[in-house]
């Protein structure tokens, strides 16, 4: 059977014209159009773009930079360079880092000892800038070297419009004199919503356990509480069911949020940046309302499911042996889609969609299936045809001979 699909769901080209605020207001919120982010992208973890809004516009990542910092550190843990249980003793220098004005942080005191895991928790919870600087210096001995590694990783991932100037995401002018010396003449990092989507997708695929940290709403260290700045977590003031991360960010350029949520096997990552004005409580809360609305509509319109099972199937009038189950993201409101088989015998679902750089449509191997009865039927038809032609020829010859023998 030939299955066909047309895509006219929420996140198609026609609805790309809707701004994030318009989409949010469709969910009964009332936000001013001026609260639109500078850039936004909604993706699945395999890089399928469900919604885009100025996805390649340059933005200030602010503290969402810490997601790259965490990725680099988790890579180090994965390669046994460091361990989550390794201890870091707080020096006077580290204490002073945590006392810088105009920075979100968690107070560190000389003589205290923290594990790398505890310092990592400070990054998504209190958005501690000091914790990321301490970790970078502890691991590489030099914050510049750590920042270099962040930028190399960005290039390897295809984040070609991204540049980091330190591990915290703060403006280098604010963290003086602890800014990376190599980057002291630079100020803020820059990226795009699309590049940060690449980062969050990669981070969650490679290290899904990081969600155990990003979904924490509170933690206690040295009798002091840390509070997660992500107000979209389920029990927070703007909480939404199924949210389990990731990171907020704030700078003079506005308010950012990298949000992730999972429902019925579909994980959706929403990245939005630079909602203005700053400072503004309205804009601060708007980042959560907008991200929540974009995420909810992704769940409303899309699902992740088994499209076709392993085994024999009729596709486009032919029988194929599908080598394994094919799972994919498909629109909920469409009962028709098209299964296409490539010249290399790869089966995939085709509809109007895009992916981030380096990602592709899921596919499975198929093989044409030999059908004995069908082949026998074709052979029988051929034989019958030959016999009929032969009979006609014989009759024609006999008629011809009879006609001309009388002459």
What is the role of each PLM region?
Residues 11-13, 150, 287:
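Generic signature of intrinsically disordered, low-complexity, basic-rich segments
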Residues 17-193, 204:
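Active-site-adjacent loops and short helices of periplasmic peptidoglycan-processing enzymes
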Residues 1-16, 379-399:
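Sec-dependent N-terminal signal peptides of Gram-positive bacterial secreted proteins and lipoproteins
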Residues 176-177, 183-382, 392, 396-407:
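Domain-terminus/edge residues, biased toward the C-terminal soluble/receptor-binding domains
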Residues 5-17, 85, 345-351:
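Generic low-polarity alpha-helical segments
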Residues 12-15, 24, 406:
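Intrinsic-disorder/low-complexity regions
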């Amino acid at each position: 059977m030939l299955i066909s699909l047309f895509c006219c769901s929420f996140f198609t080209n026609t609805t790309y014209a809707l701004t994030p605020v318009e989409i949010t207001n469709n969910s009964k919120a009332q936000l001013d159009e001026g609260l639109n982010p500078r850039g936004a992208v909604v993706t699945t973890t395999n890089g399928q773009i469900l919604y885009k809004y100025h996805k390649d516009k340059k933005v200030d990542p602010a503290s969402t930079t810490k997601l790259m910092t965490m990725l680099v550190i988790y890579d180090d843990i994965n390669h046994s360079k460091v361990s989550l249980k390794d201890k870091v003793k707080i020096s006077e220098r580290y204490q002073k880092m945590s006392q810088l004005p105009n920075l979100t942080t968690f107070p560190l005191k000389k003589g205290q000892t923290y594990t790398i895991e505890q310092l990592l928790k400070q990054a998504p919870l209190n958005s501690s800038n000091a914790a990321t600087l301490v970790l970078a210096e502890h691991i590489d001995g030099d914050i510049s070297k750590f920042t270099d590694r962040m930028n190399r990783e960005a290039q390897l991932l295809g984040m070609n419009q991204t540049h980091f100037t330190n591990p915290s995401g703060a403006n280098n002018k604010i963290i003086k004199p602890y800014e990376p010396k190599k980057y002291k003449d630079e100020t803020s990092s820059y990226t795009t919503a699309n590049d940060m989507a690449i980062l969050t997708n990669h981070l969650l695929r490679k290290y899904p356990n990081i969600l155990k940290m990003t979904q924490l709403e509170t933690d206690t260290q040295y009798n002091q509480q840390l509070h997660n700045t992500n107000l979209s977590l389920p029990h927070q003031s703007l909480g939404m069911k199924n949210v389990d991360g990731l990171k907020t960010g704030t700078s003079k350029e506005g308010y950012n949020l990298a949000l992730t949520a999972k429902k019925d096997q579909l994980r959706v990552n929403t990245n939005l940046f630079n909602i203005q004005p700053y400072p503004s409580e309205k804009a601060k809360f708007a980042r959560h309302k907008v991200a929540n609305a974009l995420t909810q509509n992704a769940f409303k319109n899309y699902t992740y499911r088994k499209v076709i099972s392993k085994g024999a199937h009729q596709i486009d009038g032919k029988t194929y042996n599908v080598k394994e189950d094919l799972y994919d993201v498909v629109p909920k409101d469409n009962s028709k889609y098209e299964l296409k088989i490539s010249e290399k015998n790869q089966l995939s679902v085709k509809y109007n969609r895009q992916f981030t750089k380096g990602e592709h449509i899921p596919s499975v191997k198929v093989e044409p299936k030999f059908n004995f009865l069908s082949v026998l039927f074709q052979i029988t038809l051929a034989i019958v045809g030959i016999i009929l032609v032969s009979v006609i020829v014989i009759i024609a010859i006999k008629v011809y001979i009879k006609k001309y023998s009388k002459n």
